[in-house]
Amino acid sequence: MTANEFILALDQGTTSSRAIVFDRAGTVRGMGQREFRQHYPRPGWVEHDAGEIWQSQLEVAREALRNAGASAADLAALGITNQRETTLIWERATGRPLARAIVWQDRRTAAMCEKLLHDGHGRMLQERTGLVVDAYFSGTKLAWLLDHVPGARKMAERGELAFGTMDTWLVWQLTGGAVHSTDPSNASRTMLFDLHAQDWSDDILALLNIPRGILPRIAPSSARIGETLPEWLGGSIPIAGVAGDQQAATFGQACFTPGMAKNTYGTGCFMLMNVGDAPVASRHNLLSTVGWSLPAGNATHATYMVEGGVFMAGAAVQWLRDGLGIIQRSADIEALAASVADTDDVFMVPAFAGLGAPHWDPYARGTLVGMTRGTTRAHIARATLESIALQSAELLSCMNADSGIPLSELRVDGSAARNDLLMQMQADLLGVPVVRPRVPESTALGAAGLAGLAVGFWSSLDEFGAQWQAERTFEPAWPADVREARMQRWRQAVELSKGWSRPAAGHA
């Protein structure tokens, strides 16, 4: 084994920490994975223990190296990809979190977002950040932590506090507190980042009463930003690539030219389309975001995306398993759903944590409609599976309209992309081929690619992208009229779910 033969990618997700060792062909050589606990202290609240995440991430990194038969000396670089928006504050001197991290799914700041909109800040925030004002993003979560964690605001004003999303937290831990940084893909999900200036917005920080000093510096997505302490993985490894999970997956799917798009089917479901070197203002409440930034001479060059996010995709299947007991394992849903020819007009709207793009209704709730005495668990399973494809099709229609670029195919990844029935549903509802890659680990591969480019492991985007290959293509089978009728029925079901948990007047 020769030195610098591999790249290690850390993939810090919503429900588990993973690590994967890749070779130059983009082949997985070793892997590790650990789930960690989800905390639900109140309805609508979701939290993670950042210390547990760090320990689980360190364990799986060591496991991946063991499984690859590799050591730190065999690694050219380390890349990081992460669940986005999840918000943490910690003490600079000790690295001790002041509270559990507030997860992207958490809705506790919905009322704060409503006040921002009521006070007339919505348009400015959307124009500056590319985001819709929503509790999903980090900005209001950080403001909440500063106002509700005892002593946090005074510590922040004294310069004793650090804020970060999960990438920043892992870099801090890996470098022993030497590096406090993020990349533009993660920064652009905070609602604190000016897409056009490519920097934190002082106006937004003032609006939310957030001291600039607690924010990390912003480094390119592909750049050497520090080195791991030798005690963590047996040697110093350059940390050279960082991107939020959905942007990393888009990079790993080699969506390098405008009009290329991917959908990742995980806990949530996220579709991103490359729109080139300038942000696109959405007319359909989609998000405009940074895909990645690469060094270009003495400057950096950002690639922009439009994104639609579904809060509940695989999580809806988990609810069938854990909440209703309809299936014993998530993988069982495909056979159960395939045991009936259709849903018999049953629709599931999995708005358990509100609705994301293009509706953005934090008060929507999960809805199951169209049931009769003839409805079986198979119909409910099929409706749940179809809801994932329906939400994605709705988003793609908006993306096409915003970008003016028709899609010729959709590249897919994530755990649920292994479900052949779901992928065929997706092709039928989109009317374009759905393509699953040979290497399913697109998110981790994207982080590896960004790190590898920074250290010369791959010489160019073209060299990295050349390894992408299709494993299977799902061709659409439905005519346009059938497709549109199904989408229209879905829109009816979505309307029924909206506003369900909105507080009554005087009871907020």
Swiss-Prot record:
Positions bound to ATP: 14-16, 267, 314, 318
Binding site for glycerol: 84-85, 136, 245-246
Keywords from the UniProt entry: ATP-binding, Glycerol metabolism, Kinase, Nucleotide-binding, Transferase
Gene Ontology biological process terms from the UniProt entry: glycerol catabolic process; glycerol metabolic process; glycerol-3-phosphate metabolic process
Binding of ADP, residues: 14, 18, 267, 314, 419
Gene3D superfamilies documented for this protein: 3.30.420.40
Reaction(s) catalysed by this chain's protein: glycerol + ATP = sn-glycerol 3-phosphate + ADP + H(+)
Class in the EC hierarchy, top level: transferase
GO-annotated cellular components: cytosol
Pathway listed: Polyol metabolism; glycerol degradation via glycerol kinase pathway; sn-glycerol 3-phosphate from glycerol: step 1/1
Regulation: Inhibited by fructose 1,6-bisphosphate (FBP).
The UniProt record lists the keyword ATP-binding: yes
Entry-linked SUPFAM superfamilies: Actin-like ATPase domain
Top-level taxon: Bacteria
InterPro entries xrefs: ATPase_NBD, Carb_kinase_FGGY, Carb_kinase_FGGY_CS, FGGY_C, FGGY_N, Glycerol_kin
GO molecular function, one term: glycerol kinase activity
Keyword Phosphoprotein: no
EC numbers: 2.7.1.30
CDD domains: FGGY_EcGK_like
Family named by the database record: Belongs to the FGGY kinase family.
Record-linked PANTHER family: GLYCEROL KINASE, SUGAR KINASE
Protein name: Glycerol kinase
Record gene name: glpK
